[in-house]
Amino acid sequence: MRPHAGKIALFLVFALFAVGIGGCSSHTFVQTEPSLILGAKELSGYIGKDGVVIVDTRSADEYAAGHVQGAVNIPTEDIVINVPVKNMLTSQKKIEKVMGSNGISNSTMVIAYDSNKMGASRLLWTLFMYGHRDVKVVDGGFNALSACNLTLSTESVSPQEAVFTAREPASNWLATQEEVLAQVNAPDDNRILLDVRSMEEYYEVGKVPTSVMMDYNTNFFSGDQTFKTTDITKINYMEEGIFPENEIILYCQTSLRAAPVFVQLYEAGYRNIRIYDGAYLEWSSNSGNPIEMPAGSAAPAAKDAS
């Protein structure tokens, strides 16, 4: 937790409840944009709807075993490249090809689901990066859809080809290794490096110096793995001294776990959020980058792959 963050957050929590969440607090966010998160029960209303493409981001084998009727399959591997490190943002040209071949145009609403809490959000962030904002992720993913007794299909889908034009990558959603290093060397109090890996990973392999640790799992309810409510999210992050007016740079091991945190923070009103796409894998691979280890911990050893 950042210095004095707990006392500040506690005060703000009382203030929020005193005026009511959505009242006049300077830290209150009023949702004016469509939600990025779609309840599993709501998906049935979009199946077969014109202008909507439902995307299953699971593996081809999982898709073949049963998927939402009419859903196309875009596994995460189709929207990333492994250069210079694993799971980097793929090219403009590749995104245009993948989206177009799956019937997605610039006017299409995309609704994505996964089974790992990461794939759908990574697709959302990727589309944001290339200028497409009409995207939603299904809360709770495939497990939540299965619990709704939604009719599944094992038939593959052959969508009509569409034209998708990707814009130049949006720098406001992306952070580079150089920018992270600049923050380490000359910290800006308004900028926060947010490490969403587990504390176990920190103890085993270290972290980027000055970064705040907050496991991405804290954004989900432990039972059904759905996103926590916006109000709970605001309080959780304020308790760590992370406010909507801060500039936040997210990272994990390969930037997959950072994606659902991006979605949840955006949903809670945070707009100055970027993902360090090279993530800790790139950072720790560069011998010139400093690494912060907890006192008394063992030497770094490679661990998680996401």
Model regions and ranges:
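Thiolate-centered catalytic microenvironments shared by cysteine-dependent enzyme domains
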Residues: 26-31, 84, 89-178, 257-273, ...
